[in-house]
């Protein structure tokens, strides 16, 4: 086992605080409408230019082990805030640095760190309560657009496209962000349920222009095994032919004789049939087949529930108004399933989302909810170069998360104003314990940090602006984009309550850990000069006794 260095007390905290400052100073230059860019080196290809706090934080690894521990703890603040609220990473980092900076002065002066921590916790609880009181529900498309714009570093086009997407697919619908092909951002909306499986044979195409098979008012057969024998399918095909309606077959696979017969019948115009593979794999495939069954009002034909292909009746088949099958995707529009059944299924999946442990599972479950509930909107981000594309895409994703957070918990005045108003509301909070009161005091001072940083990045004088804002009331604040004062909500400068709350709670949590640290253990640096000399090579020809 390698030797370890153990550092105690003030020295340990001082080294950690140095690490916190290095990371926070790199991150906080991106805060506000006039935030600066940070350039990140890449091992290959062009460097990345970003104004996204969490992207900067993730890149930082310090050589000094003890400094690095401090930096990694603050990186955790940014990542955690990003995971929960999807935005507010820079605000969280600035708050954490401010609480650590103020707190370490008190600890150095001999105050008890545990009492300071209790005071910090009490102040945070009181501030969060005030933020919730000040919160206003987001109802209009305009407010949603404003939240998106602020999060995307005051880019109004991003806010507008997110608001449009939410109008189209609802606030619960899935909105994904992809690379676009043009210079402009584009919005594409997929109505109904779409899954990523296309026709099994190009002979099924009946619309050459779209290169797709379009079925109007079709039946839908859902089967969870392979179909290779046409005899199994004959009873179903006969019933569908009598009803003179098209049929979509969704099965694990359709192959051999069965596929050939379907193709021949389609070409001859005897039947209008399309076969596609079922989406997903394993258990997820079964769940998605069940989703399609509920959406179309049909049943999944599976042996475990006692259903076989030979015994299928028209009542077991799903129905839809229209189905489009392309080379890679199938879209079911206006399924005939009962609204109550669909709602019950959505509720069931939501419970699974809450219980899901991995991000991947959660994402897939959310996609299933959206496909059942509202549809999917795709925002295609346009840019001139790949470097710009990456930066823009990261901002759009941030803005999307912030907008979702605003819909969830409402909005407060942006630009650091909400925290100042909360500070004024709890200004006379006291515990009767001087050391805990010091903890409260340091948090109330630290909440000024985001506004101070926004002003500093815009080239203003932070103290002057903070005093001016504190003298105002309600949503009165400073618009750093054009150096004016006024009502923040009217100027469209809003923050989601969830983002501000999460940033404050996570910053205080990690800062408290740093302040109550009394010892640090890290691997001792290896002494390069003490390395043994390399053994000599073989002698030349003259030394070999020739």
UniProtKB/Swiss-Prot annotation:
Keywords: ATP-binding, Chaperone, Cytoplasm, Isomerase, Nucleotide-binding. Its EC number is 5.6.1.7. It catalyses: ATP + H2O + a folded polypeptide = ADP + phosphate + an unfolded polypeptide. The keyword ATP-binding applies. It is found in: Cytoplasm. Its main location: cytoplasm. Pfam families: Cpn60_TCP1 (PF00118). GO terms for molecular function: ATP binding; ATP-dependent protein folding chaperone; isomerase activity; unfolded protein binding. GO terms for cellular component: cytoplasm. ATP binds at residues 30-33, 51, 87-91, 415, 479-481, 495. The keyword tRNA-binding does not apply. Residues 536-546 have a biased composition (Gly residues). It is an enzyme of class 5 (isomerase). SUPFAM superfamilies: GroEL apical domain-like, GroEL equatorial domain-like, GroEL-intermediate domain like. GO terms for biological process: protein refolding. Residues 527-546 are annotated as: Disordered. Belongs to the chaperonin (HSP60) family. PANTHER family: 60 KDA HEAT SHOCK PROTEIN, MITOCHONDRIAL (PTHR45633). Forms a cylinder of 14 subunits composed of two heptameric rings stacked back-to-back. Interacts with the co-chaperonin GroES. This is Chaperonin GroEL. It comes from Acidovorax sp. (strain JS42).
């Amino acid at each position: 086992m390698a030797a370890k260095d153990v550092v105690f007390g003030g020295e340990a905290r001082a080294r950690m605080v140095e690490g916190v400052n290095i990371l926070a100073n790199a991150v906080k230059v991106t805060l506000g409408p006039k935030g600066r860019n940070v350039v990140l080196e890449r091992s290959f290809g062009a460097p990345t230019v970003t104004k996204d706090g969490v992207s900067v934080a993730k890149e930082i690894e310090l050589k000094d082990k003890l400094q690095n521990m401090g930096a990694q703890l603050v990186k955790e603040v940014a990542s955690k805030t990003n995971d929960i609220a999807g935005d507010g990473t820079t605000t969280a980092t600035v708050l954490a640095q401010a609480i650590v900076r103020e707190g370490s002065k008190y600890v150095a002066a001999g105050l008890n760190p545990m009492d300071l921590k209790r005071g910090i916790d009490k102040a945070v609880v009181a501030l969060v309560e005030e933020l919730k009181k000040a919160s206003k529900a987001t109802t209009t498309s305009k407010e949603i657009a404003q939240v998106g714009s602020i999060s995307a570093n005051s880019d109004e086009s991003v806010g507008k496209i997110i608001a449009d997407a939410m109008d189209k697919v609802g606030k619960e619908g899935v909105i994904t962000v992809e690379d676009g092909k043009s210079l402009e951002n584009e919005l594409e909306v997929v109505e109904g349920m779409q899954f990523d499986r296309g026709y099994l044979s190009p002979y099924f195409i009946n619309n050459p222009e779209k290169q797709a098979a379009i079925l109007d008012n079709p039946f839908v057969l859902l089967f969870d095994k392979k179909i290779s024998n046409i005899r199994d399918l004959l009873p179903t095909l006969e019933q569908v032919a009598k009803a003179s309606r098209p049929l979509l077959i969704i099965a694990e696979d359709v192959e051999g004789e069965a596929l050939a017969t379907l193709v021949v019948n389609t070409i001859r115009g005897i039947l209008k049939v399309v076969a596609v593979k079922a989406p997903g794999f394993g258990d997820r495939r079964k769940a998605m087949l069940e989703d399609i069954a509920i959406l179309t009002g049909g049943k999944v034909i599976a042996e475990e529930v006692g259903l076989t292909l030979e015994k299928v009746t028209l009542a077991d088949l799903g129905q839809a108004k229209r189905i489009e099958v392309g080379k890679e995707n199938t879209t079911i529009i206006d399924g005939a399933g009962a609204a109550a059944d669909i709602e019950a299924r959505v509720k069931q999946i939501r419970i699974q989302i809450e219980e899901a442990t991995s991000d991947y599972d959660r994402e897939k479950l959310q996609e299933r909810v959206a496909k059942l509930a509202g549809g999917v909107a795709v925002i295609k981000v346009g840019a001139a170069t790949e470097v710009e594309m990456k930066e823009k895409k990261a901002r759009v994703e941030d803005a999307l998360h912030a907008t979702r957070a605003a819909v969830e918990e409402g909005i407060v005045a942006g630009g650091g104003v909400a925290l100042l108003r909360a500070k004024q509301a709890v200004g006379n909070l006291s515990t009767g314990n001087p050391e805990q009161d010091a903890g409260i005091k340091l948090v109330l001072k630290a909440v000024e940090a985001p506004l101070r940083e926004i002003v500093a990045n815009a080239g203003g004088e932070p103290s002057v602006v903070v005093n001016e804002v504190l003298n105002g009331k309600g949503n009165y604040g400073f618009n750093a984009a054009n150096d004016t004062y006024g009502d923040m909500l009217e100027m469209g400068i809003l923050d989601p309550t969830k983002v501000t709350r999460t940033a404050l709670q996570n910053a205080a949590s990690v800062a408290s850990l740093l302040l109550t640290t009394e010892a640090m253990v890290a691997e001792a640096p290896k002494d390069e000069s003490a390395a043994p000399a390399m053994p000599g090579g073989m002698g030349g020809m003259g030394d070999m006794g020739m």
